[in-house]
Amino acid sequence: MKEESIIRKGNMQPWTHGKESDIWVSEAIWGHRLKEQPLHALLAEFLNMAEGMLRQGKFLHATEPQQDIQYQARKAKELRVILFHNPTLEQVAEKHNGSNEDAWAQWLKNIQEAARSSHPSDFSYLKDRFPNFRDFLNRVHLIRRSVMNPGNNKKWSHQLLFPMGPSALYVPADDKFGRDRTLFTRSGELVYLMLSRADERLREELAKQLSEKLKGGSQKDNITLGLLPGGQGQFDDANGGTYLPYLSHPAYNRLAEDLLNLANLELPENDVFDVMKHLIAFNLYLYALETSNHWCGTSSPAILVCEVMNTKSDVVRQYSGVCKRDNEDKALKAVENYCEQLIENNQGLCKILADEQQTEDVKVASLDEFLSGELSLKRPPTKITVEDYKKDVMRLAKDACRRNVIPALASLGRIAGLTTKQGTNRLRYAPSDSLIRALVLANVPERVEEVKLLDKLFERYRIVISETHASQILPEQFVESSHYEKNKERFTRRLMALGLATRMSDACTYVKNPYKDAI
């Protein structure tokens, strides 16, 4: 069945809460905003917003594009100073070994001096909780082991913890401990908004499952909570500003279904989030490509021809690279079409521009007035023609897309585990073990023949691995049967090596979800 276009009348709502952009085009197409972000930060930003909405009692309540959805995030100022801005902790413990009073007195003096300039705090509450200074030292060491992406050379106020519980969730901070958007770029918040637009049944079921993982009080959560002070002031002011343009989109339910299927498995809590980060990056990538397609005149999902890692180049590898470039380059065509349609859909403006009795200055002024409002265009006035003005706006819009959206697409493909340069000097679609495992966990509720899994991956995500699906949709010159059959055989071997498949005596391969089924 043909998908309805997401750009149909009534499915988009404009953003009216302030536009943080020199030209609001990419944001109007993909949202505010799609920007390059590390995988651990994408997951953490999503969970921060989810937990903040849970505290409000609005977790996965339905949202609309025109709403400015705001939430309070944890500052965790004291926690971060203790963990990441505390250089003398080990020295004090060594120097005053055996004397808790001396150790606490020296450390409290040191930490007050370290925190005095921009983040003054009273850390004396820790002495009451940890009479033995060594217990405090061991607690700090234990929590430091849960740092996500350790050794990444980020500033100390940007270091993030694995989400052991809500007390381990907080937002990257600037020098004054306000929200810093260099690491949390809003892409994780876009993921939350996508889920909030899924069908009601999916939202309710997913909210029930994820709420349990975001509530406090667990043993793991208490480990981090022990370093936090009590009382008020633990949360920042409510912040919003993230915009997702579409009321409905095929990507919303697809993402919600994947996460719900994952949440329904009896995975250890750490594994749930480890798999989840790949699923949300992958689904956000699909959302972006599919959105580009709609603006380019087709409601079909993007095709992902995937090489299962090979030692040499073949037709599959060649087309997987071509396919990736074609998919991501459509973003620029989407920008072009958006700008053209914006002008064409304003009948009053088109009438002025077509009126031969109007001077060029009047036409340019009318065009400038309209686009300055719609696009938040910050452009110095110059005496030019209408066509020059249009070209200038198009150039600015495409430059912004090249700065933000194109790198974001490349980053999402890479961090999801969908793309790689391994064995070549160009990126191509070649899924990693982590992504393959995530897709199996989200799509195999019970033992299934491998061919049926391949059918599902094709129907659901447009992933092409075998000759069966390649021959349905690819140009004839890129369908070499033997190459795709070898690609499928490598996929089988990968599944078996990951413990996700077994080849039976009848030569039929069965794929299993290790948390739902045993062969």
Language-model features: locations:
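Short, charged/polar micro-motifs that form catalytic or ligand-binding hotspots
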Residues: 177, 196, 237, 242-245, ...
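Long, internal scaffold/assembly segments composed of regular secondary structure
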Residues: 230-374
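Alpha-helix boundary/N-cap detector
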Residues: 34-37, 41, 98-102, 124, ...
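Charged, amphipathic alpha-helical stretches
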Residues: 1-118
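Surface-exposed polar/charged interaction patches
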Residues: 49-56, 89, 114-118, 143-146, ...
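Charge-rich, solvent-exposed alpha-helical interaction surfaces
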Residues: 42-49, 78, 82, 92, ...
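Long, mid-chain structured domain cores
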Residues: 93-266, 270
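C-terminal structured domains
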Residues: 351-519
